[in-house]
């Protein structure tokens, strides 16, 4: 049998390193309960694991408060949350058609609902965006 070469990493990483499978298998066997919802031992231990992860990620990203770190399902969900959460009525967003659908779709949704205006800046045959085009698209 030949070894598979996975090239769809924009969708997910596969295969994952064995350490990930081992950790997650152990986590679900030992801590597969809702964190922070009850006072029994497994829930408390699970919350400690989750909060420990928050602390590690906060340090990794040079943050200052692990309680401000939010987990989501995936990058697409995160982008959707951020874009819809930050957009305000009357905002103008400059982007390109090179963006992933997880960026373009929420922007399109907000534009179609009259919340924001979107300007798409062009790109050349090599996929490069001219910074001057971005400057020209900006509004006060």
Name each model-derived stretch.
Residues 1-140:
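Pyridoxal 5′-phosphate
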